[in-house]
Regions:
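Short, structured motif recognition centered on aromatic/hydrophobic residues
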Residues: 33-37, 44-50, 119, 123, ...
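Small-residue-rich transmembrane alpha-helices that serve as helix-helix interface/gating elements
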Residues: 173-186
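C-terminal ends of transmembrane helices
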Residues: 14-24, 47, 72-85, 130-140, ...
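Ordered, amphipathic secondary-structure segments that act as subunit-interaction surfaces
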Residues: 69-106
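N-terminal topogenic module of multi-pass integral membrane proteins
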Residues: 1-40, 44-56
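Cytoplasmic-side transmembrane-helix entry/capping segments in multi-pass membrane proteins
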Residues: 29-37, 60-64, 85-96, 120, ...
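Structural signature of hydrophobic alpha-helical transmembrane segments
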Residues: 1-10, 55-69, 113-125
Length: 204
């Protein structure tokens, strides 16, 4: 089940990356590159930091093919995307939590503790989007008050709590997927935001 969600997630993330590249007027190569970075960048950063080799997309090059195809398809169906915004927000929410779970599980399988596992989950969940926004010369989404990285962080610790309470692994995954997905959609619906820090060094 988690593999299927992962495939859906990287496809959706690749398409959002392609749209971001399109808004910047990039050529097809740029579109494919941004799409792949968005979909696979978080997992790659996690693998490098944890020394988890080979990288996921190197071990499974079909993921690279899938994200590239998703980017090309997006070029042709981009005019329809505005009508599918709600669907993409839902898929993105699923992807965020699925990536977070995979990041946590990868760290735990390597023998790391809960703190490292939670950080691994957040990196996997959000870093692809950070790289996308940086490459597209935008302020990363997670730094703009919106509850995104926070959802990933809470989902990671909720999953770890479930494991600590010795819930069956599949049950822990399902509960985390549901709660993280619901929290993300509620944050979007009700515009929940993190407090903003504004510093002005003018002396009066």
């Amino acid at each position: 089940m988690l593999l299927m969600l992962y495939l859906i997630a990287i496809t959706a993330e690749a398409m959002t990356g392609a749209l971001s590249a399109g808004r910047r007027g990039m050529d097809w190569f740029g579109v494919v590159l941004i799409a792949c970075v968005t979909a696979l960048g978080g997992g790659s950063v996690r693998d490098v930091l944890l020394g988890h080799y080979p990288l996921t997309w190197v071990k499974h090059p079909e993921y690279l093919v899938l994200t590239s195809v998703a980017a090309i398809v997006t070029i042709f169906i981009a005019p329809l995307m505005r009508h599918l915004r709600s669907l993409f927000l839902a898929l993105d929410a699923v992807g965020l939590v699925a990536f977070t779970l995979i990041g946590c599980m990868t760290a735990l399988e390597m023998g790391h503790g809960m703190l490292v596992a939670s950080v691994s989950g957040v990196i996997t969940g959000v870093f692809g989007g950070i790289l996308r926004d940086i490459f597209c010369n935008d302020i990363p989404l997670i730094f703009r008050r919106e509850l995104y990285a926070s959802v990933s962080f809470l989902a990671a610790w909720f999953y770890l709590l479930c494991l600590y309470l010795q819930l069956p692994s599949e049950q822990a995954i399902l509960l985390t997927l549901f709660s993280g997905f619901l929290l993300r959609l509620l944050a979007i619906r009700f515009h929940w935001e993190m407090p903003k820090f504004v510093y002005n060094d003018d002396v009066h």
